């Protein structure tokens, strides 16, 4: 039997491993009908003529998002930061409503992205 700090460390490691396994399993469980939306949203988010999110944001949860941009906040934990999808949608549609001094373009208001394209990008962002 392990005593003292060793026992505490062993229990801590076990809890962390169990929690990590549960977390990784839960984020990999996207519904099959969401997968095409996520892929399409990712493409729109990274496309220079559309979302161009990589120009300003890091995507720590996406190994294929090759950027060093740090103008805007890192796009991670989006679902927990914006549990209300409508609030995130409004932010993408016209970010000047939340922050009049933002440099982020009003993608919907200025017609850069259609309404359905914003929804696809949100589907992707919710995986981050």
Feature map (PLM): residue ranges:
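N-terminal secretory signal peptides that target proteins for export/translocation
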Residues: 1-9
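Gly/Gly-Pro-rich "capping" loops immediately C-terminal to redox-active cysteine motifs
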Residues: 54, 58-93, 109
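Bacterial N-terminal signal peptides
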Residues: 12-22
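Solvent-exposed, polar/charged alpha-helical surfaces in well-ordered, non-transmembrane soluble domains
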Residues: 39-43, 73, 86, 90, ...
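Electrostatic cytochrome c docking/interface patches
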Residues: 27-48
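Short pre-active-site segment immediately N-terminal to redox-active cysteine/selenocysteine motifs
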Residues: 48-52, 60, 117
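C-terminal capping alpha-helices of c-type cytochrome domains
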Residues: 97, 108-128
């Amino acid at each position: 039997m392990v005593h003292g700090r060793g026992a505490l460390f062993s229990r801590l490691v076990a809890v962390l491993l169990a929690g990590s396994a549960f977390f990784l399993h839960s984020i990999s469980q996207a519904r099959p009908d969401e997968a095409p939306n996520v892929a399409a949203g990712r493409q729109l988010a990274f496309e220079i003529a559309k979302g161009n999110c990589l120009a300003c944001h890091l995507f720590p949860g996406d190994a294929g998002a090759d950027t060093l941009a740090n103008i805007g906040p890192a796009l991670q934990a989006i679902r927990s930061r914006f549990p209300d999808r409508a609030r995130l949608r409004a932010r993408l549609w016209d970010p000047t409503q939340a922050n009049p001094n933002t440099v982020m373009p009003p993608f919907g208001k200025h017609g850069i992205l259609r309404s359905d394209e914003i929804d696809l990008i949100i589907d992707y962002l919710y995986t981050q």
